[in-house]
């Protein structure tokens, strides 16, 4: 409400409109069901004003300014939400591209993502010859990587699918203030090059491949629910799926045993700071499914990622629909339908 507009003004961005109803200090947050930009409903009033003003971009944060959500116009002029995976991908693509263009990139620079965040970031890092590190969910693990490399390597950006991002290493936690400023810079860069934020996203998909991510939360409240979640994880661990929505599983990662097993039964060790109750399955077509119990709520979470090839921006909607059908097939394979 205060810090983000001040930060944007500091960077010379004076054509900023704030939603009037949401500039009133009220800890009950009466304008939304939940003041969390992960939820589309939280951006309703912002979208209302963005349409009236014909704005270039909508950005939103939560009250403690750590998560950032955004929306922009697509090629048809329709407002679309940019999810957490897409946001993280755009941010890291821009940071790498900008540092290379300005001669600031060093061979020792690195980025970080969580293991459940889109694998397209790995493709970007690989093609751009930048070190990328995977860590567990939760920004403390990204901060850990920063601390471990302090004085030896430079962290230049990192994030997670749950709308948290950090550029540079000053804050050591997800930070919507710097993220919103970075987003504004990316939009200015796009405009200078005759593009929009949506065009930038499509360019990334065209170069590195299309990816669709979807998170499923299965709630199981109470003691019986907790036991059911434990049993689900035990069943997945002892009987991992061989097929996910028609895609053949070629690699299983178990972070509880820190082992990865391929289709031929070969086992390699996973290098992580400690064990965690997470399972991941990777398929021959790039499909990835991660499953873990929530650490704070009575639910088990499934993170699904499917791949395709996007040649033209006009294919995006059709590919998204195709991917969602694939995700439905994967849900059926997992017994979630």
Predicted regions and their residues:
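Active-site pocket-lining segments that scaffold enzyme catalytic pockets across diverse folds
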Residues: 1-12
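Short glycine/serine/threonine-rich phosphate/pyrophosphate-binding segments
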Residues: 1-3, 65-69, 142, 165
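N-terminal small/polar loop signature for handling phosphorylated ligands or for N-terminal nucleophile
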Residues: 10-67
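Short, structured coil segments at secondary-structure junctions
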Residues: 11-12, 75, 128
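Gly/Ser/Thr-rich active-site loops/lids in small-molecule metabolic enzymes
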Residues: 15-18, 78-96, 178-182
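Phosphate-binding and adjacent anionic-ligand microenvironments
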Residues: 51, 55-57, 61, 78-80, ...
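Short beta-strand-to-turn element immediately C-terminal to the catalytic PLP-Schiff-base lysine
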Residues: 70-73, 168
